[in-house]
C-alpha cells in the first residue's frame, strides 16, 4: 500500500523561532505563509510543516498523488481506495472521505498512542 508523500506537521509555539531552528538544520521554506502562522519546509525529500495555533497535536501526513515536491504523480491510489483498504484491515477512522466524490479528499486515523494520521489528497 502506497500512501503518498510523507511529511510531519509540527505544532509550534513561535513560528519564527522554529523556522530559524530548522533552517540551521538545512531546511528551506517550500510553501506556506508565515503571516498566517504556517510554513512548509523542505530538506532534500524530507518535508515538515510548522503550524502555530492551528492544531492541538503533531500530525503525520500522507499525500496520495504527490511526490515530495508536491508534483502530481502520473499514477497513484486514490484516497477513497486507500480508505477502503484500511477499513478492511480493521483501521478505525475519525473522519472519512466521501465515497461518492472524486478528486481532493481526506480521512483521519489515530494510531494506538493517539497520534493523528491524515491521508490528504489534493489532486
Locations of the language-model features?
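N-terminal beta-strand motif that seeds the catalytic metal site of vicinal oxygen chelate
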Residues: 1-20, 122-123
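Conserved short beta-strand elements that form part of the metal-binding/catalytic scaffold
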Residues: 28-70, 116-121
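Structural preference for long, well-ordered alpha-helical segments within the folded cores
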Residues: 20-24, 113
Amino acid at each position: 500500500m502506497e500512501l503518498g508523500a510523507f511529511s510531519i506537521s509540527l505544532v509550534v509555539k513561535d513560528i519564527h523561532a522554529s523556522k530559524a531552528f530548522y533552517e540551521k538544520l538545512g531546511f528551506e521554506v517550500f510553501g506556506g505563509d508565515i503571516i498566517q502562522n504556517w510554513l512548509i519546509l523542505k530538506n532534500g525529500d524530507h518535508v515538515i510543516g510548522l503550524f502555530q495555533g492551528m492544531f492541538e497535536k503533531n500530525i503525520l501526513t500522507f499525500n496520495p498523488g504527490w511526490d515530495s515536491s508536491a508534483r502530481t504523480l502520473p499514477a497513484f491510489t486514490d484516497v477513497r481506495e486507500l480508505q477502503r483498504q484500511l477499513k478492511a484491515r480493521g483501521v478505525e477512522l475519525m473522519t472519512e472521505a466521501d465515497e461518492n466524490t472524486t478528486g481532493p479528499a481526506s480521512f483521519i486515523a489515530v494510531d494506538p498512542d493517539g497520534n493523528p494520521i491524515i491521508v490528504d489528497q489534493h489532486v
